[in-house]
């Protein structure tokens, strides 16, 4: 594989003479210094990059600096790297689609005369679409967001505008946010933002540090713009040109915002929408409702493996890869990408999607027919955009035509369905398809193509305007054919004069240099040499023969070339005219693309549900104010899809007042993390409108999923594992509501055992007593299981805390620990670690000491401060004074209660830490005369 890569991406030789090199060096020095810009120079057959860009490319993509060459000499030498066209596509895709830290510039020219012809950034890839998607589908829609924050009295109001250049949509929003910017983060995730426009001056304020962190968590490129660009001047006239339809509703919409309008002004300036007249009258504008979808932050997206990652071993590792099982066209894949970031909260719309999926699951014949027809549908959205940008031609129009003529087959398949959901299928798809394909819409487009394009030539791979479409073109075609006939007659006449066989001895060629010429082999040349020198003009003598002409052939050839040039020019004019006419159908094709892409995604959901070895079920969906989350026989869809896994299903019953808050304990690698994540994934799938991997499921709609799972070190940002845990947990404490779903895994590992336990206990109490959200809390702190007993004693509690554990079996004969991966009620046996050490043949002295120390710690465990001796089991006798133990335990319990009362969701992190330090200092003072309590400090 490496050999093939090297073969395809060989380093082209950098060929510049001294004069060209000097001219280029002079130009290169005039370029402004921009550390984010990666500049490429088109040298016709290959590209080059220079200076720091060349070093970056050599190290990042060639993985060696031996690829570098020096342009010039001495102190003026400039490091350079040459790049093949294949490699340029690879690099451009990585810079614009995968990374978020560079812009791309492409220059054309020679010597010292170069001009910038293309610029691109992660949020604005339009100029490079022909390169990025020449051999790959466009799976995501890049969105540029502009934000204008206002800080006042410790609060922040965000004005936000965004543009989706693929779907031609502008959006506005304005909302209050907390210090962790949870609303902004979930909005960026939902929109799929790749780049964020931000006022340069605002970035210098202390308040913006957390805002910048939020943007970085979402992998969004930050582009600072001068503050004077964030003004709403001339917005009315700009929007009047851009937005389709009546301007009055647009004015009413925009007038309702204070901060979003400056953000929109900067966005229009940055995206240069007004510089392209093709955009005029083609955009829609809408209010973006941050509560319109389930909120997902970057931590939840990462924890639930929603989107694909470069590290995935196969596509089934991510939810997108799994559910993108049979999406055929790029527009369907892009819609799925968007849906997974925007799960629904509208009960009726969720049920409608589920009805359609159920229809497709139950009607295998309908599903297969529709899938076969959709396979022949092209990416309508991309074809349309290429035509609108005048980068497409007849080939794009033909693909639209071939897609359009498949619609009657799709309609027929739907008309034949008479099942339970026939009326829904008719309303949702059939009637809309009939309206779109009538004679006033796509019927007219089909007529246009059939009368303007020579469809017979498609078999030869030629895309041409039909000569019958235009009288001038028809006349030129007749002239061309007449001249072709005259040239062939001259060919025959000349063969008779020279006594040579037509096409065997005397051939008629068309050369790029000479036009129409006669050719004979060198063997035949001596036979006609005398006539050749007196009656003809010899043009070229080579091994393949002698090329010659005469005045008649040259005259006819020149006339023929002139007519061909006129014919091509007329063809081009007519193609441009047809393309312009086709773009008038943009709105119809946009509606068609939306219809077909939705059908494509829901068919993919049905294919997944029907093809899985263990069936999926349709979830019962209830409102967020009622019902529980009950999953019977639930499975993790991505884990069970791996070839090497025999998945053990588990039940999960998050029930109000009984088990709304679940503490899950058990040995490492026992399945705790998989279990709690699969619940989050299943809820997300259900609210997207998919069947779920369960035997039976009932789900109360959630407005948000929060996940704190497996934080890693972020040293490059100066953030430790523990700090990352705390930051993510702070987002949960501030942003969660009783309608959210919370998933927390192994909180408190990055600090001391007692600090970690104290934090875990306090966070649990806060979530139970204040947030009251359904929560799955996997932990290695077995003492937390006492929370269930403590919570049951609180009067008026409606949450319900329950203990669950993942089970394991120790075989005393084989000395093997077997994970059973079953989640069962109750707390976990805490002795697995020492058993495993014993069976691993640890020295007996080490095992004995471990048991002794474990017993000591059990005496001093935090649970002894919470529940009585009878409930916590028998304790080893100890020498501490009972009064001292009682006094110390009471003080420790007071500390934990005070800690739990801290309003973490309303305090800045530094203030919270300061308050904890003060409490700890007070505790240490009180412990000075208590030996038992000092053992914990």
UniProtKB/Swiss-Prot annotation:
The induction comment states: By UV-B.
Where is the protein localized? Nucleus
A Gene Ontology MF term for this entry? Answer: damaged DNA binding
- KO phenotype (gene knockout): No visible phenotype under normal growth conditions.
Per UniProt, where does ATP bind? 666-673
Residue ranges, annotated region (Disordered)? 861-888
Q: Which UniProt keywords apply?
A: ATP-binding, DNA damage, DNA repair, DNA-binding, Nucleotide-binding, Nucleus
The Basic and acidic residues compositionally biased stretches are 871-888
Q: What is the effect of changing residue 404 to A?
A: In strain: cv. Landsberg erecta
Renumbered to this chain, the Polar residues biased-composition regions fall at: 861-870
What's any one GO cellular component for it? plasma membrane
Result, substituting residue 737 to T: In strain: cv. Landsberg erecta
> What's a GO biological-process term for it?
mismatch repair
Q: Which InterPro entries match?
A: DNA_mismatch_repair_Msh2, DNA_mismatch_repair_MutS-lik_N, DNA_mismatch_repair_MutS_C, DNA_mismatch_repair_MutS_clamp, DNA_mismatch_repair_MutS_core, DNA_mismatch_repair_MutS_N, DNA_mismatch_repair_MutS_sf, DNA_mmatch_repair_MutS_con_dom
Family from the record:
Belongs to the DNA mismatch repair MutS family.
What is this protein's function? Component of the post-replicative DNA mismatch repair system (MMR). Forms three different heterodimers: MutS alpha (MSH2-MSH6 heterodimer), MutS beta (MSH2-MSH3 heterodimer) and MutS gamma (MSH2-MSH7 heterodimer) which binds to DNA mismatches thereby initiating DNA repair. MutS alpha and MutS beta recognize single base mismatches and trinucleotide insertion-deletion loops (IDL) in the DNA. MutS gamma recognizes specifically the T/G single base mismatch. Plays a role in DNA homologous recombination repair and has a broad range of anti-recombination effects.
Q: How does it assemble?
A: Heterodimer consisting of MSH2-MSH6 (MutS alpha), MSH2-MSH3 (MutS beta) and MSH2-MSH7 (MutS gamma).
What is the protein's name according to its record? Answer: DNA mismatch repair protein MSH2
Origin organism of this chain?
Arabidopsis thaliana (Mouse-ear cress)
